[in-house]
From Swiss-Prot:
Protein name as catalogued: Protein Vpr
Function: Stimulates gene expression driven by the HIV-2 LTR. Prevents infected cells from undergoing mitosis and proliferating, by inducing arrest or delay in the G2 phase of the cell cycle. Cell cycle arrest creates a favorable environment for maximizing viral expression and production.
Subunit comment: Interacts with human UNG.
Localization: Virion; Host nucleus
GO biological process, alphabetically ordered: symbiont entry into host cell; symbiont-mediated arrest of host cell cycle during G2/M transition; viral penetration into host nucleus
Residues with PTM Phosphoserine: S84
Keyword Transferase: no
InterPro entries (alphabetical): RetroV_VpR/X
Note: This isolate is from a German AIDS patient (with predominantly neurological complications) who was probably infected in Mali.
GO CC term (a single one): virion component
Assigned keywords, A-Z: Activator, AIDS, Cell cycle, Host G2/M cell cycle arrest by virus, Host nucleus, Host-virus interaction, Modulation of host cell cycle by virus, Phosphoprotein, Transcription, Transcription regulation, Viral penetration into host nucleus, Virion, Virus entry into host cell
Protein species of origin: Human immunodeficiency virus type 2 subtype A (isolate BEN) (HIV-2)
Name of the gene encoding the protein in the UniProt record: vpr
Highest taxon above the source species: Viruses
Coiled-coil intervals, chain numbering: none
Amino acid sequence: MTEAPTEFPPEDGTPRRDLGSDWVIETLREIKEEALRHFDPRLLIALGYYIHNRHGDTLEGARELIKTLQRALFVHFRAGCNRSRIG
């Protein structure tokens, strides 16, 4: 079995991102688009400010926003959204 190549920080001096950070950012974009189809944008903006104030501009904040939006969309769909694709 061969060893995985060693990771090196970017040459421009920017800090290394966590593994999976690209996935978190892409998932947040996708769930945000879906949430905008179902919720008032003002509500989503207020939620974003709230989470940003608690977690700052971090991956932890992005993960928290994903979890919150997933829960909200799940409840919304279970309550009988007319545009639901899941039931």
